[in-house]
């Protein structure tokens, strides 16, 4: 019988398992089987020229080994003794007046998967005690994440190089608890996308739909967004990471309602991210040109998903998506030539300029992708994930086709490349802006598990958009 998300998340975040995993990776990288792992949580920071606090975001590697979201905290992991300790801020009477009582040591020990909880005032003493008991072994830390008052003087060796790499490589493969967190983030985000579909026809401005999305996420338990949401109407959708989210949905020049809204948005649930993109017609029905492009992008995604399993080279999946785009644009008459010629010339990059996807976890663009931004092939330059897919890794699959004049015009004006694009046919598609469809999937040995439940068939989206 399958364990439900609720059952899984009723347990503790598996910090101890993660600490062991990172320690094992340190050993695999040739740095020994003993020593202390030392990490600091994010500090409380103040807004410049203000007495207000900056929004807090816990350091991801610290959270991975602690499960602790508290600011100004620390951790140590004694590799040989297999002892994980977190240090949390003590009670400050002056702060209690304003903020209430903080978490106690006893409460923290009940909540977190650790062996001991101490006050942050005891960090240096604890480190010194370890050195005394173990003969001054090695400490592993991240160079720019050690507070000035922390002293490693008693240690024989300080390693600032391997810990960050070991933690980030360990984070690529998710355990069942992490997948449950990602699944919950996707469930909540998918419902919020549906709420936007249902409001699309009546909305007057991009920000209204953003507010509906964020409100739906918050009411379901996600206070934070994984990234700044993208609510791009009409031709704004040709900008990949459009940020304004504040334009009217009726064009001020033509008086016409814009065709579509591209929604790239995902909630963060207990530090784990969803990253979902959908497109909804603002009239309730896709225009013929919009539907043609949508169908191509959906085929790009379906073809990519069909290839996914552990060990498959991500570059091959990405290339397949480009080929599907080429075939679709040839059929519409936007492109001219043969599939092979267009692929080799990189013409599809004019319409699909970004990578197919990336790893997902506590960061939207999660660790382990090994991108190569120096790649001279424009098809692969912005591919954030390279190499074979890892079983248990979580990836986004997000093909798209865009009609961005800034990108396409140089192709049109090129003596070598312009002949492959039919400018007359292309002219009918500028108003589509862009279409992207993005799901989050767990890579398995024999395929994938799609965490994203937001509808993506065009008929389903149109039905939701026109519901009364």
From Swiss-Prot:
Cited Gene3D superfamilies: Creatinase/methionine aminopeptidase superfamily (3.90.230.10), Creatinase/prolidase N-terminal domain (3.40.350.10)
What Enzyme Commission number(s) appear in the record?
3.4.11.9
**Example GO molecular function term?**
manganese ion binding
Free-text remark on how the cofactor is bound: Binds 2 manganese ions per subunit.
Which InterPro entries is this protein grouped with?
Answer: Aminopep_P_N (IPR007865), Creatin/AminoP/Spt16_N (IPR029149), Creatinase/aminopeptidase-like (IPR036005), Pept_M24 (IPR000994), X-Pro_dipept-like (IPR052433)
Catalytic activity, as annotated? Release of any N-terminal amino acid, including proline, that is linked to proline, even from a dipeptide or tripeptide
Q: Supply the alphabetized keyword list.
A: Aminopeptidase, Hydrolase, Manganese, Metal-binding, Metalloprotease, Protease
The protein's required cofactors: Mn(2+)
Can you tell me which residues bind Mn(2+) 2? 264, 275, 438
Q: What role does this protein play?
A: Catalyzes the removal of a penultimate prolyl residue from the N-termini of peptides.
The UniProt entry's sequence similarity note says:
Belongs to the peptidase M24B family.
State the protein's name: Probable Xaa-Pro aminopeptidase PEPP
- Source organism of the structure: Paracoccidioides lutzii (strain ATCC MYA-826 / Pb01)
Organismal lineage: Eukaryota, Fungi, Dikarya, Ascomycota, Pezizomycotina
Give the gene name. PEPP
């Amino acid at each position: 019988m399958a364990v439900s998300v609720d059952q899984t998340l009723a347990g503790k975040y598996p910090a101890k398992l993660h600490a062991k995993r990172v320690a094992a990776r340190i050993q695999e990288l040739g740095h020994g089987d003993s020593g202390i792992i030392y990490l600091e949580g994010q500090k409380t920071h103040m807004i410049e020229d203000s007495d207000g606090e900056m929004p807090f975001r816990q350091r991801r590697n610290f959270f991975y080994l602690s499960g602790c979201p508290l600011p100004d905290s620390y951790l140590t992991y004694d590799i040989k003794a297999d002892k994980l300790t977190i240090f949390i801020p003590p009670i400050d009477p002056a702060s209690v007046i304003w903020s209430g009582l903080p978490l106690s040591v006893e409460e923290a020990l009940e909540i977190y998967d650790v062996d001991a909880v101490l006050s942050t005032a005891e960090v240096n003493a604890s480190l010194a005690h370890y050195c005394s008991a173990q003969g001054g072994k090695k400490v592993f830390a991240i160079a720019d994440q050690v507070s000035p008052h922390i002293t490693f003087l008693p240690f024989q060796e300080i390693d600032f190089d391997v810990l960050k790499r070991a933690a980030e490589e360990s984070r690529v493969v998710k355990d069942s608890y992490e997948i449950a967190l990602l699944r919950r983030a996707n469930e909540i985000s998918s419902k919020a996308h549906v709420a936007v579909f249902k409001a699309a026809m009546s909305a007057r401005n991009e920000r209204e739909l953003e507010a509906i999305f964020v409100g739906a996420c918050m009411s379901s338990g996600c206070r934070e967004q994984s990234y700044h949401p993208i609510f791009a109407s009409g031709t704004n959708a040709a900008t990949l990471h459009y940020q304004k989210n504040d334009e009217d949905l009726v064009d001020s020049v033509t008086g016409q309602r814009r065709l579509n809204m591209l929604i790239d948005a995902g909630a963060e649930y207990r530090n784990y991210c969803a990253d979902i993109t959908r497109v909804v017609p603002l009239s309730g029905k896709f225009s013929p040109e919009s539907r043609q492009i949508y169908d191509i992008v959906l085929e790009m995604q379906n073809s990519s998903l069909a290839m996914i399993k552990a060990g498959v080279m991500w570059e091959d999946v990405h290339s397949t998506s480009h080929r599907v785009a080429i075939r679709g644009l040839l059929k519409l008459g936007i492109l001219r030539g043969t599939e092979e010629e267009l692929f080799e010339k990189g013409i599809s990059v004019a319409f699909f300029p970004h990578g197919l996807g990336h790893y997902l976890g506590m960061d939207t663009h999660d660790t382990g992708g090994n991108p190569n931004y120096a790649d001279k092939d424009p098809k692969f330059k912005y591919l954030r994930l390279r190499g074979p897919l890892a079983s248990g890794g979580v990836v986004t699959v997000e093909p798209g086709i865009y009609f961005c004049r800034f990108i396409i015009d140089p192709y049109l004006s090129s003596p070598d490349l312009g002949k492959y694009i039919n400018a007359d046919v292309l002219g009918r598609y500028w108003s589509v802006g862009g279409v992207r469809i993005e799901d989050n999937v767990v890579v398995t040995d024999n395929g994938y598990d799609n965490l994203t439940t937001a509808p993506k068939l065009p008929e389903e989206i149109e039905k939701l958009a026109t519901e009364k």
